[in-house]
């Protein structure tokens, strides 16, 4: 079998009107991942609906409802090859009510491309753009590039490009902790393909890489095989003749037959008999592998979705309480001590109570603005002490970042996102 190229997960982020889906569609077409005939058909469909220019976006906006609204809702995954990688695109939704998807999407990303409209230099940075960049930073994405889109609308003006580059650098990236000097800003016209996959003939002043070349310059993630084993359970099946088969994705560490393991917070202990992926038995599985495995000594009723598997020598941490850094994204009123929304962390969904709001922070710099504030509102960042209403596994981001991040949901929306910075473990 030929060695496949390494996979790189790249999130495309930015405001809903910046042309993200069109940029992605163009990458897929010029990268040979979609049939040009499909674009011809979608162009016709777009024109009939009075949405000319949406044909590339339709590739990612696979859901019918999305096509009609012209809005990306779910996290869509598509692949295309570059010289170096097999790139999986995570096209993150742009609208506020879909931030939950954004969080689950971004946490799978190794790098991100922020798509901005060159016209933003006139209108200012959209709040949504800020939120997206802040979120990927909070979720641990450290590699970023910026696509300055719709350059054809300003006749590929170098002055307009430089104005936007300075604004994004000074007013957004520096404040959030990215160094603009180390970030590629690529002038593109995605609808026409300029500098997306192929170099543009229309802006001779730009000598830098295309979006595809920038993606090739990203570093592949190092698999966290040296961290303790953590595998959040997604589902548990009973297979005749085999027994109990939990399934999930290895987040950290390595799992292999013969391992003595424990599921927390269930407390069930067993031994791994077999590990399978795509119906093939594996000698071991590592981070990123979606596997099913058979455990001796553990029944279907003993464990459930949201439990986390680890080795008995280094079990997952069950928190009695934890301290977290959070950012409030949206809330109709204010958050105070005693507030108990649902926390989504790995595969678990557990209500946690705000025991104490300890500090309010500047969301851009992290400096303390106020000690022991009475409340938090949308846009605030804070350090808070939280108490789970029932046992849950969460790890400190300093130790196992993959299990330290969470989204907070309430009233059908994502009200906040954050990470655990200190965890008080339940005594075994």
Curated annotation (Swiss-Prot):
tr-type G domain sequence ranges: 5-225
Region described as G3: spans on this chain: 91-94
Keyword list, A-Z: Cytoplasm, Elongation factor, GTP-binding, Hydrolase, Magnesium, Metal-binding, Nucleotide-binding, Protein biosynthesis
The UniProt record lists the keyword Metal-binding: yes
Gene3D superfamilies registered for this protein in UniProt: P-loop containing nucleotide triphosphate hydrolases, Translation factors
Binding site for Mg(2+): 21
Chain positions recorded as GTP binding sites: 14-21, 91-95, 149-152
Assigned EC number: 3.6.5.3
Source organism superkingdom: Archaea
Location within or outside the cell: Cytoplasm
Catalytic activity: GTP + H2O = GDP + phosphate + H(+)
One cellular-component annotation, GO: cytoplasm
Keyword Flavoprotein: no
Gene Ontology molecular function: GTP binding; GTPase activity; translation elongation factor activity
PROSITE patterns: G_TR_1, G_TR_2
Enzyme class of the recorded protein, top EC level: hydrolase
CDD domains according to UniProt: EF1_alpha, EF1_alpha_II, EF1_alpha_III
Region spans: G5: 189-191
Chain spans, region G1: 14-21
Classification via Pfam families: GTP-eEF1A_C, GTP_EFTU, GTP_EFTU_D2, GTP_EFTU_D4
Annotated region (G2), positions in chain: 70-74
Function per UniProt: GTP hydrolase that promotes the GTP-dependent binding of aminoacyl-tRNA to the A-site of ribosomes during protein biosynthesis.
Alphabetized PANTHER family for the sequence: TRANSLATION FACTOR
HAMAP family assigned to the protein according to its UniProt record, in alphabetical order: EF_Tu_A
Family recorded in the similarity comment: Belongs to the TRAFAC class translation factor GTPase superfamily. Classic translation factor GTPase family. EF-Tu/EF-1A subfamily.
Record-given protein name: Elongation factor 1-alpha
Native source species: Methanococcus vannielii
Gene assigned in the entry: tuf
